[in-house]
């Protein structure tokens, strides 16, 4: 079993500008040198081939750091202790010159997909560095057992919806979740004073609606006393444990406000609500990463401990299993209707 560690990340220090009379002096960093570590990121999902992103860490004060692809790493995949594959490096797709260079290098399995009941270990070797590794197994699927909705038609043509995603938390285990939501909407921009024209396409918009769960108590627990400095950490990734709902049935509430689709012109709205069952390691990593980012430049906060389950390295190997339910208003796709995707 890999020993789980807490790696201390120092947030960016707010440097106060000192006014000098006529000169400035460059001060070299003289702290203890920190050796680079291997960074590993991998999220195991059913029906998806195993993919690993690797990188090298670098000191925050390192001069002229330039990210580059690591093409010669050795990335080994084990299942239940048995080596089953050495993953293949995949070059990134060409990007415009003004795009930043990605610091992560992708290594992909040629066909291995994780299955429930097995533990997968990923080992990464790079020249001159300590071998790093992390492991995970797929958590059980927690099925969505129902979707309850209420709707309020607004005078301005918008529809206020409340959706309750129902599920039962298994008793006897510590379970961890993430609530994700996405919308796909089709809008017709033709003249609506005349009948629908097949020459006018329905424009499709897609967006992340996970924020709709922000007001649910398991996502944002209520506090009786507000922090004097209003420093409550937001739940960036919409994750939660079963601490408040252990062994119980629960209905998680999402609140949305969107335009009411005009089905006479083949407009539609689709809302996908995805209940993700995630590993404890992934939960801890997302939770502490969120806190780290939000306290990064806070003047009076302590440095945040960011969780990792990587031995001799940084990052996380996690896993998730999902159950999805869809709310549908209108029909999509419809034969004879032209659709185009919005670039915004």
Question: Which positions does each model-derived feature cover?
Answer:
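A sequence/structural signal for flexible, mid-protein segments enriched
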Residues: 24-344
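C-terminal motif of bacterial Sec signal peptides marking the signal peptidase cleavage site
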Residues: 19-22
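Bacterial N-terminal signal peptides that target proteins for export
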Residues: 2-11
């Amino acid at each position: 079993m890999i020993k789980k560690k807490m790696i201390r990340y120092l947030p960016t220090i707010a440097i106060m500008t000192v006014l000098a009379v006529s000169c400035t002096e460059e001060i070299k960093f003289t702290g203890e040198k920190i050796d680079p570590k291997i960074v590993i990121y991998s999220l195991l999902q059913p029906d998806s081939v195993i993919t690993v992103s690797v990188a090298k860490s670098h000191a925050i004060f390192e001069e002229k750091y330039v990210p580059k692809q690591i093409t010669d790493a050795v990335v080994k995949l084990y299942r239940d202790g048995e080596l089953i594959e050495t993953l293949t490096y995949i070059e990134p797709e060409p990007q415009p010159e003004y795009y930043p260079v990605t610091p992560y290098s992708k290594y992909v399995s040629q066909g291995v997909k994780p299955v429930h009941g097995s533990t997968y270990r990923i080992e990464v070797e790079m020249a001159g560095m300590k071998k790093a590794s992390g492991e995970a197994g797929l958590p059980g699927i927690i099925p969505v057992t129902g979707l309850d909705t209420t709707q309020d038609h607004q005078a301005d043509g918008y529809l206020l919806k409340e959706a309750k995603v129902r599920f039962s938390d298994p008793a006897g285990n510590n379970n961890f979740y993430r609530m994700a939501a996405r919308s796909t909407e089709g809008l017709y921009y033709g003249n609506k004073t005349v009948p629908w024209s097949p020459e006018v396409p329905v424009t499709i918009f897609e967006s992340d609606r996970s924020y709709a769960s922000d007001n649910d108590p398991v996502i944002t627990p209520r506090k009786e006393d507000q922090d004097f400095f209003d420093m409550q950490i937001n739940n960036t990734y919409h994750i939660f444990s079963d601490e408040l709902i252990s062994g119980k049935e629960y209905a998680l509430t999402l609140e949305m406000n969107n335009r009411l689709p005009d089905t006479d012109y083949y407009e539609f709205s689709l809302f996908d609500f995805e209940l993700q069952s995630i590993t404890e390691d992934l939960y801890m990593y997302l939770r502490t990463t969120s806190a780290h980012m939000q306290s990064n430049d806070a003047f009076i906060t302590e440095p945040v401990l960011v969780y990792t389950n990587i031995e001799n390295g940084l990052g996380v190997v996690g896993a998730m299993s999902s159950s999805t339910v869809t709310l549908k208003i209108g029909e999509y796709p419809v034969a004879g209707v032209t659709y185009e995707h919005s670039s915004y």
